[in-house]
Amino acid sequence: MASITLTPSEKDIQAFLEHYQTSLAPSKNPYIRYFLKLPQATVSIYTSGKILLQGEGAEKYASFFGYQAVEQTSGQNLPLIGTDEVGNGSYFGGLAVVAAFVTPDQHDFLRKLGVGDSKTLTDQKIRQIAPILKEKIQHQALLLSPSKYNEVIGDRYNAVSVKVALHNQAIYLLLQKGVQPEKIVIDAFTSAKNYDKYLAQETNRFSNPISLEEKAEGKYLAVAVSSVIARDLFLENLENLGRELGYQLPSGAGTASDKVASQILQAYGMQGLNFCAKLHFKNTEKAKNA
């Protein structure tokens, strides 16, 4: 899905609104002045003056403001915040979310370090480069422990809305540190409509427009950095939880997790699983019936 961020003049904004006034739609985001649902695109006009165009027809509508596709500035050439999460698909371990701020002058350093999507790197490589990234790159890391995850899921949050809350909070806290991104990219885990719906429940908000992009870790180094740091945080948490229980906790939610879950249930009961696992996964019922 194409995503374009522009900062046109107020005169151009008003001309755009007049031209497409029949496409105006309501928005629950207090930082969006105007929201338009157009054929093959949505347009969010923020109080900050920025405009976010998303969808297959984004370039067409951006041309109204003089935008040309050949002039599109890649996210790699902008000061950028990127976010990613790790642990969502694993029965054991917490949920780690990281927002990282990367500037173009850091790109060579990151490439030489071998930064890429954590899914393409070995755990050994991640544990090796993550401490360097934590020291050199401004970031905000959040970890929701399994016990806290189990406490909030089904009460205030579901598996998607809890990620919205964590991504939003990580970005908010990083912005509070004074970074000034020209773009904010989230590795898409839900639709923009769903994200905005759940975001309305959150207290800490910011006016910067965000872009949800699929496979963003392969497009933006800031997202790749977040992916690596989040993976390292998740692995560290997995090790620490296992050490306290005396078990080696596997990542993922396959048969290996079923086996260990059954053993922990026999040794510690549900209290043990609540300490180290996400209970709403099917692995819990499998462990009970083993």
From Swiss-Prot:
Keyword Metal-binding (UniProt): yes
Presence of the UniProt keyword Methyltransferase in the record: no
Protein localization: Cytoplasm
Any one of the GO BP annotations: DNA replication, removal of RNA primer
Segments forming domain RNase H type-2: 78-290
Pfam family, one: RNase_HII
Residues at which a divalent metal cation binds: D84, E85, D187
GO cellular component: cytoplasm; ribonuclease H2 complex
Main subcellular location of this protein, as a coarse class: cytoplasm
Entry cofactors: Mn(2+); Mg(2+)
CDD domains cross-referenced by the UniProt entry: RNase_HII_bacteria_HIII_like (cd06590), RNAse_HIII_N (cd14796)
EC number of the protein: 3.1.26.4
Similarity-based family: Belongs to the RNase HII family. RnhC subfamily.
Chain's role: Endonuclease that specifically degrades the RNA of RNA-DNA hybrids.
Name of the featured protein: Ribonuclease HIII
Organism from which the protein derives: Streptococcus pneumoniae (strain ATCC BAA-255 / R6)
